[in-house]
Amino acid sequence: MKGEQQRVNVVAWLILGADFLMMLTALTLTLPPQSFALSVLAPHVAAAVLMAAFGPYLFAGVDWLLVIVLLIGHLWLMHLLVRRVRTFEVFGRWARLARRLALGAAVLLSLLACYYEFPVKEHYEFASSKVSGEPVRLAVISDLHSCSYGGRADPVLCDIAGLNADAVLLTGDIFDDRLSDDNAQNLVKRIVDIYPCFYVSGNHEYWSERIDEMKAWLRSVGVAVLEGECVTLSVKGTRIDICGVDDPTYMSDDQWLGQLKQADEQSDSSHLRILLTHRPERVSDYELFGFDLIFAGHAHGGQWRIPFTGRGGYAPDQYFFPRYVDGRYDLANGSVMLVSRGLARESTPLPRLFNSPEILVLDIGGR
């Protein structure tokens, strides 16, 4: 506990220092547009960084007093910034009102940044004539990147435990190439105690150069690791083929398509056929086969999402303004692809903005 407290204190001073430096930069700029923009956006970015760094400690209930003091300091810095930014002088007699509006906008954006750091459950529905019994519920976890959401009060686990799902699907980057495996292992072990669990690899797990070790551990706790394979599951009278392919990081195109073809051939077209993959951008490859459902991750929801548009700003391997980042996509061959925004927070180089971490939930009924 002492070591953990020391880490919290260090992070607190680092975040407060970064917050101060961003606002000091805004104060020293002379060009009105940049100065005004930073006066509003700097607190938002700082709040997002704050939540990314403190997320595990907030959920674990460690030193709430320190967090409250830090937030008070954050608000004080915002107030100081808005009072002193020279940009507002251009508004003449309306300068005071403009300052108040800017401060209100900064506070609102900061609160939104904090709100969007909490994980949510996104529910979808899908109808198929292959479902002959009661509806089937699947939960998808993607891109955890070994992040922590707390100990016993882990909201991710609590949400999953309360879903009454029939299976949990892990669509890659559950582990990270830089962080310890402990957080990911703790969550996976507790999920496996409740539900059948299926996994495919992600690019960061390959980058770690410990992919074989990770897969061996997953198998040892009862997770089905899919490498161009298919497992048949009987759920409430419905036969489901859960297929999966490895991330293509170190594969040739022929090897990648070979895994997809092998999974396709192992599955039964009379069953509900589901493909687990990490990469949503490989749509043209998926359209060569006839899977009913495809689950993917990797894009992190576009990392910085544009408010009210549902559009992401950037995703790996899709770059700026990516097409496949979140939600449902109907493919040309009739397949439906669902992309999870994932759960990564403190492990990402940039904080998530307007982009809640998510658990994807799909209810599949008959028609």
Stretches with model-predicted labels:
Residues 108-109, 122-125, 227:
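Short structured motifs
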Residues 131-367:
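Soluble catalytic domains of enzymes that build or remodel membrane lipids, polysaccharides, and related
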Residues 1-119:
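Non-catalytic terminal accessory segments
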Residues 102, 107, 128, 282-283:
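Hydrophobic alpha-helical segments, principally membrane-spanning helices and signal/leader peptides
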Residues 118-132:
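Alpha-helical transmembrane signal-anchor/signal-peptide segments
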